Amino acid sequence: MRAAHNDVSLVALFRTTRAEAEAAFGKADVYIEKLIQHAKHIEFQVLADQHGNVVHLGERDCSIQRKHQKLVEETPSLLDDKSRDEMARHVLRATRAIGYQSVGTIEFLVEDDGSHYFLEMNTRIQVEHTITEMVTGLDLVKWQVRVAAGDKLEFDQRDIRVRGHAIECRVNAEDPAQGFAPSPGTLTQYRVPGGPGIRVDSHAYLGYAVSPFYDSLLGKLCAYGDTRDEAIARMRRGLDEYVVEGVHTTIPFHRRVMDDPAFVAGNVHTDFLETSASI
């Protein structure tokens, strides 16, 4: 991706991007889109069966990212009700229009004035589905399988209730102090947190070898609370109790995020890493 900020750079970068696309993919086709520089990354979880039933399960804020990859997600977002309802209508209409059948996620960039722009639809379960499960009580993986088997949804939109607040931190084998560089190695200590409202999904274990060739995700630490403040407090505790040694991880980064004034106030955007002085 290239960002053009004036007519001159647009022409030059258009030529550069076409050349890069031709060299990498054998096709010089490129997309030109409006550049949204200060926005939130909001995504809606949808579930649709083979019988025409479609529901959404609320939205997640995935604005804290590095290299356009998500690091922290939370649900519900802090959208105002008007924006949330309008986007939800668009999501349900789009899902029905394409005849979608399964779990999926429709993603947007949202500006502070409520203007929102469609990014993509992920036609699969996502890493951050866990926090939606925590606030809705639904097992999304189970429903993905049941829908594929032809089962009918046992509920409609009126039955969906979002209760409380949930946050997910992706614990990656990366070094935040070195621009999130990969940190392969062997885990010499590995202990996950527990307690009320804490959920950890992880494949890692003591002695696990972190490869430099695959995704750096070691685990997903999720915290649930009746309120956002309680979820943040539980996440802080979970991060303090999560012990990983032998490789660098994003745990210290997440701990700073939980104390960052902008995050605590819910005032985060996709440029959070570039604009936050405390991170």
Where are these regions (language model features)?
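ATP-dependent carboxylate activation and anion-phosphoryl transfer catalytic cores
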Residues: A3-I279
